[in-house]
Amino acid sequence: MDWDLKMPVSWDLAELEHNAVPNMAAAASAAEPGIAAVAASRGAPGRPECSVDLKLGGLGEFGAADALKEPAAAAKAPVSSAAAAASVAKVPPSTSTLKRPRGGGGGGGGQCPSCAVDGCKADLSKHRDYHRRHKVCEPHSKTPVVVVSGREMRFCQQCSRFHLLGEFDEAKRSCRKRLDGHNRRRRKPQADSMSSGSFMTSQQGTRFASFTPPRPEPSWPGIIKSEETPYYSHHHHPHPVMTSRQPHFVGSPSSATTAAFSPKEGRRFPFLHEGDQISFGGGGGAAAAATLEISVCQTTVVAPPPPESSSSNKMFSSDGLTTATTTTTTAHHHHHHHQVLDSDCALSLLSSPANSSSVDVSRMVQPSPAAAAGAEHHHHHQIPMAQPLVPNLQQQFGGSSPWFASSPAAAAVAGGGFACPSMDSEQQQQQQLNAVLVPGSNENEMNYHGMFHVGGEGSSDGTSPSLPFSWQ
């Protein structure tokens, strides 16, 4: 079938609608009698019911629906036209308003505000927006005194208001209230900064003390003096006393030593009796057979036992944070055995006096009965412990050596002696004379002479007894 596109298409809607109703009703009745009955009942002219749902063959209701919709459309048309007219009328005012002055621009909408100062007729339209907004001209905003409503006032450039003259600061251009708030914001109260001086205090101390003040040390040079007099008689074997010049920490050997005794000079005991002297020579006698054990220390403490093959004694001590070297000088009958041992641990921390001079302080320690029984044995033993004992030297030697007599000066200067029990009673030496040397900063020695004797209270297996260490 050919379509002629050039022919104008004309549709008669009323005629189509009129012819479609009986045709659809006949088709519906032929197809289904129930649907035709429903359509006939709904399409009755006496019922003005408008159906909005989809129904098959409901073309006959379009006419009634359109008839009902036409009055509503006619009623809406005037309303929409009125709304369009109103919107068109509102557009010009909204587009015409470009910028309005804020905050009391004046009585009328288009009237420019004037200056609030009495008698000022300045046109603020030529001024900045700031002046128009606050109703003040630029000259009067900086004038110290103006009259506003019959009162002398001044314009505050900080809060942008007129204030009385009493509210203003003389040197500033702002009122005191504004200045106080400004200063409070800028000068906030800050916490007091803790200076280092509050922590690093002197010995008097303050609230804060970061470290304790040092202990007062005795002034040894003020108590004891030394004299360079040939008071020792040195014969053929010099006895070197080794002291440490520099601090030796735990496990470090002694690097530099100096000899305190030499055949050319001697030291004197000014606090002993005149004529009392000690001979370090090789001459015979009970005093010469005593073992001399000179240790560079201030306190003797517990030390681990050495092997059985060792023939020396160790004494461990500390000078501040240093470990001093130990010199053991053993004088047998007609023979002197010298041996220097470096201490390898420090069990106590004590500080020695600075600038200590070379002084000899006599100390007396009473030996145990086991020492006399094993005097003929020449084996050295470990000194495991130290206990203070202050006996009389006359009981030790039976008056054989007048030098060992106790004097009040020696008892006042020297502390308590130390009697050290040994490990084996059968292998004990003769009485030992120990000189405790305290190294000073001037390379001199302080000699505390006393009898340190190794007792026989130890066990035979070489272990040292565990005794408490006490100070007196």
Swiss-Prot record:
GO molecular function: DNA binding; zinc ion binding
Entry keywords, A to Z: DNA-binding, Metal-binding, Nucleus, Transcription, Transcription regulation, Zinc, Zinc-finger
Cellular component per GO, a single term: nucleus
Cellular localization per UniProt: Nucleus
Pfam families according to UniProt: SBP
Record motif Bipartite nuclear localization signal, residues: 172-188
Region called Disordered, residue ranges: 89-110, 179-218, 233-261, 358-381
Binding site for Zn(2+) 1: C115, C120, C137, H140
Binding residues for Zn(2+) 2: C156, C159, H163, C175
Zinc-finger ranges (SBP-type): 112-189
SUPFAM superfamilies the UniProt entry points to: SBT domain
Statement: the UniProt record of this protein carries the keyword Nucleus: yes
Low complexity composition bias: residue spans: 252-261
Polar residues composition bias: residue spans: 192-209
Expression (tissue specificity): Expressed in young panicles.
InterPro entries given in the database record: SBP-like, SBP_dom, SBP_sf
Matches recorded under PANTHER family: SQUAMOSA PROMOTER-BINDING-LIKE PROTEIN 18, SQUAMOSA PROMOTER-BINDING-LIKE PROTEIN 4
Function statement: Trans-acting factor that binds specifically to the consensus nucleotide sequence 5'-TNCGTACAA-3'. May be involved in panicle development.
Comment, domains: The SBP-type zinc finger is required for the binding to DNA.
Full protein name: Squamosa promoter-binding-like protein 18
Species assigned in the record: Oryza sativa subsp. japonica (Rice)
